[in-house]
Swiss-Prot record:
SUPFAM superfamilies: P-loop containing nucleoside triphosphate hydrolases
Keywords: ATP-binding, Coenzyme A biosynthesis, Cytoplasm, Kinase, Nucleotide-binding, Transferase
Protein name per UniProt: Dephospho-CoA kinase
Function: Catalyzes the phosphorylation of the 3'-hydroxyl group of dephosphocoenzyme A to form coenzyme A.
Length: 196
């Protein structure tokens, strides 16, 4: 039997973490998360963090020398060229971590949580693409509440990714998170039990 590698993606604040947590807790699937790998990439003393400080100055660092994420976010979500520069450093690191995780896993089903799965051409790492969607107004509201952002800041982050409609068009499975949690989890169960 070939290994199923689910690429779990969706827009920012659509419910990817909810789905991933459910797949881990209810179905006991191994979850590998791009956001965790990306945080590792810029950890204290890493060459990528040094490059970021070299480009933006020491003001991009907190007093303990770690990355000031909100400050970096202000830069990269307002300037596409800066975002692309940062992604060119972080994404190869993240891809390598995924390749290592896949190679080392013996599980018949793996879940790779990759918010920018489609945008950064990592679809070749997975055997199926699951996209979590919700309404645009829900996405905006959730993001503003979760990250304590203004409307403009939240919209800039949403605009930095492909639209939910574009992602859904490429998906093997679309999980609609615009109603209840129960409905979302039922969709996950159905998708998991259906071999593509």
């Amino acid at each position: 039997m070939t290994q199923r590698i689910i690429g779990l993606t969706g827009g920012i604040a659509t419910g990817k973490t909810t789905v991933a947590n459910y797949l881990a807790s209810a179905h006991h699937l191994p979850i590998f998360d791009a956001d965790i790998y990306a945080r590792d990439a810029v950890s204290l003393g890493s060459p990528i963090l040094d490059a970021i400080a070299g480009r933006y100055g020491k003001e991009i660092l907190l007093p303990d020398g770690s990355l000031n994420r909100p400050k970096l976010g202000e830069i990269i979500f307002q300037n596409q060229d800066e975002r692309h520069w940062l992604e060119s450093l972080i994404h190869p690191y993240v891809r390598d971590r995924f390749l290592k995780a896949i190679a080392e896993s013996t599980s018949p089903i793996l879940v790779l949580v990759i918010p920018l799965l489609i945008e950064v051409q990592m679809t070749n790492l997975v055997t199926e693409i699951w996209v979590v969607i919700c309404s645009e107004s829900q996405q905006l509201q959730r993001l503003m509440e979760r990250n304590h952002l203004t409307l403009e800041q939240a919209q800039a982050r949403i605009n930095s990714q492909l639209s939910l409609k574009e992602k859904a068009a490429i998906a093997d499975v679309v999980l609609d998170n615009s109603s209840s949690l129960e409905s979302l989890l039922k969709q996950v169960d159905i998708a998991l039990n259906f071999e593509l």
